[in-house]
Amino acid sequence: VLFTATCHTRLPGAGTAQYFPNLSRPSWLPTSNDTVAASTSPLALHYSPAENLEHLDIDLIEQSRDHLDIAMYAFTDQAVAQAIVDVAHRGIPVRIYRDRQQYEEEQARNPYIAQLFAKTKNISIRVKGSRELMHLKAWSNGAMLRDGSANWSPSGLKRQDNSALFTTDAGDIRAFEGNFNQMWSRRDNYVVQ
């Protein structure tokens, strides 16, 4: 469930200088007596292994109504893959952007997910052509943005120390989708399907 977070944090005062002696204080930065209010946009931050991020991702992916854009570094979780197939079966276009080396290694070890997607209409996959990492772990369906450190692997979603941030902030969603479209349009991408 999403919530509205408002955080009031005191900024460090003069004591900061002992750790950063050459750091000058910008004029726009509040003094230690001021408070700073964080964004009040709806967001939720979740952590594994305390929470099962796989269930959170699946529940929110299933709510996709218009499209689903995914940039995922590692992707070996079959339950998440099935949720994506279910979304595509409803006629919703799904675009998946992957890191080249990670995708190739996963195909060599276990091509199950790629084979599942290959049999499914409405799923398009592109792999970054460059050897520079595509290290994002994010998705958007136009109404929700998920970002964080958690890859889509069973261990990454359930056992490792990872985070997933979910937000409905329209500006954040637009920013991700703009960046995703730029990545998707690269001329050196490999079109998988």
Question: Language-model features: where?
Answer:
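Primarily the HKD phosphodiesterase
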Residues: 57-120
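Signature of lipid phosphatidyltransferase scaffolds
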Residues: 20-24, 140, 144-193
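DNA replication sliding-clamp ring fold and its partner-interaction surfaces
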Residues: 53-56, 60-66, 172-180
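Solvent-exposed loop/turn segments at secondary-structure junctions
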Residues: 74-78, 100-104, 131-133, 145, ...
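Ligand-binding grooves and catalytic loops that recognize ribose/phosphate and carbohydrate rings
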Residues: 19-22, 103-135
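Short, compositionally biased "basic patch" segments
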Residues: 1-55
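Short, flexible loop segments at the rims of nucleotide/cofactor-binding pockets, characterized by
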Residues: 43-49, 70-73, 123-125
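Structural recognition of the beta-strand scaffold that forms the well-ordered cores
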Residues: 69-72, 95-98, 126-127, 140, ...
